[in-house]
Amino acid sequence: MARRVFFSFKYKQDVSRAMVVRNSWVTQGKEAAGFIDAADFEELKRQGDTAIENWIDKQLEGTSVTVVLVGEKTCTSRWVKYEIEKSEETGKGLLGIDVSKIEDLQGNTSDRCGKIPKGYEFYLWNKDKGYQNMGDWIEKAAKDAGR
């Protein structure tokens, strides 16, 4: 079954890593939500917290699973926390994927802040062969949530 998935991540630090994951998803004919152009994101931030919350809420509509892409600063992101809370409130499947070892545009990797979201499956993109297995991970998260 095709799923529409919301990808949650710390924008500034992990956008290039998130794009690797997202592109692997959409090249397999899947739908992704939760991506925004850097200029659009800066404009959204200038509009304030309510505008950001409304944008996140709109992006979450019609999704069945939220995938939290975890890098070095993800655990301290208030917006990632908000996305996890909203996903739990609406009964979406949740899982975490460590993206810290995916190289950024400069060829650098980073550390991982921890395993979030707590209480859900957590995978390592490189070691657990994310490109080949993410579809199965997402299906499991959806089924675990009764979706």
Regions found by a protein language model. Give the residues of each.
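Conserved N-terminal substructure of TIR/SEFIR domains
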Residues: M1-G62, A142-R147
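Conserved beta-strand-loop-alpha-helix hinge of the TIR/SEFIR fold
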Residues: Q59-E85, G96-E103
